[in-house]
Design a protein with these regions (language model features):
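Flexible, acidic/Gly-rich N-terminal and inter-domain linker regions that tether
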Residues: 1-96
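Conserved, mostly hydrophobic/aromatic
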Residues: 48, 114, 272
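Short clusters of hydrophobic/aromatic residues that line enzyme substrate/ligand-binding pockets
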Residues: 61, 65, 83, 196, ...
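Short, charged beta->alpha transition segments
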Residues: 89-92, 102-105, 136-142
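Conserved AdoMet/S-adenosylmethionine-binding subsite of the radical SAM
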Residues: 136-150, 159-304
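Eukaryotic intrinsically disordered, low-complexity regions
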Residues: 152-154
């Protein structure tokens, strides 16, 4: 059977009580946060908890991970499935929205749970792990669809799988003649860098190109431990791409965004996408108007080289996929 957690996660903060004991929320806030926890998962790894300034309620790391009762308020425009994955799911765990590529979601567990996640109604510590039969059905779908050139592993976070299981999945996909490349979307290198072991790196390396899309939203996430994890991936010849979400109070000014993108470059990450926030339930506090995002991107053009500028994108309605914000 697949094993989602290859290493000890016991020190991860997973409840309002854990957060209060760590000094990240007030004790009297716990009852209100219990209602949030009943709906949306919480997890803050030791690596991320250590970065949070407990004396600053607007700390950009804390904002990303500490739950807030505002999450229980759903705005009229917010959707449970804002990217419309469900209509494009031919078999469990697969999302096929573009002609030449498709997603594979082998599990729904993450090292941390972002408060703005567009899959927040689905992800959680139970893992949502595909059974062996479901995984074989997904493989059969990929084998039967020769137009697919790239498989994108997401979730959840694929690097939460054991090295053995991850290697098995990647190897099976890489063995399909029509698949030219693989991509893994992950927060693990910054959120839980100790997981990037030599065994995991060896499992990720395949006979076909494997791109690692690293999700990070603030320069402070690039700790020395994160830098070491990213170096282990880059030194193995794995191309690193950067993905971020434009978030109010986290990275929505030019200085913060410039620092983030420069941190990516220092760690051999090519900035790839800057996402406008998907309208998942209870995420309105993070929303940045697209006009403000465009102004931010314009301001960065005079401050950074072209290869440091990500493409600013948004999701189109009804599962139409990403498009540049214009």
């Amino acid at each position: 059977m697949p094993q989602p957690l290859a290493q000890d996660q016991s020190r991860t903060l997973r409840s309002p009580q854990d957060l209060a004991r760590a000094g990240l929320v007030a004790v009297d806030a716990v009852p209100g946060l219990e209602a949030v926890a009943a709906r949306y998962a919480t997890a803050i790894t030791p690596a991320m908890a250590a970065l949070i300034n407990k004396d600053d309620p607007a700390d950009p790391i804390g904002l990303q991970y500490i739950p807030d009762v505002a999450e229980l308020i759903t705005a009229p425009h917010e959707l449970e499935d804002p990217t419309a994955d469900a209509p494009f799911t031919p078999v469990k765990g697969v999302v096929h929205r573009y002609p030449d590529r498709a997603l594979l979601k082998p599990l729904l567990a993450c090292p941390v749970y972002c408060r703005f996640c567009f899959r927040r109604e689905k992800v959680g510590p139970d893992g949502g792990l595909l059974t062996e039969a479901e995984l074989q059905e997904a493989f059969a779908w990929f084998e039967a669809n020769a137009a697919i050139r790239e498989v994108i592993l997401t979730g959840g976070d694929p690097l939460m799988l054991s090295a053995r299981r991850l290697g098995e999945i990647l190897g099976r996909l890489a063995g399909m003649a029509h698949i030219e490349s693989l991509r893994i979307h992950t927060r693990v290198p910054v959120a839980d860098p100790a997981r990037i072991t030599a065994a995991l790196v060896a499992a990720v390396r395949q006979a076909k190109p494997v791109f690692i899309a690293v999700h990070a939203n603030h320069a402070r996430e690039f700790t020395p431990d994160a830098a070491g994890a990213l170096a282990r991936l880059a030194d193995a010849g794995l191309p690193l791409l950067g993905q971020s979400v434009l978030l109010r109070g986290v990275n929505d000014d030019a200085s913060a965004m410039e620092a983030l993108l420069r941190a990516m470059l220092r760690n051999r990450i090519k900035p790839y996408y800057l996402h406008s926030l998907d309208a998942a339930p209870g995420t309105a506090r993070f929303q940045v108007p697209e006009a403000d995002g465009l102004a931010l991107v314009a301001a960065l053009r005079g401050r950074l080289p072209g290869h440091a500028l990500p493409l600013f994108v948004c999701e189109t309605p009804m599962g139409g996929g990403k498009k540049p914000v214009a």
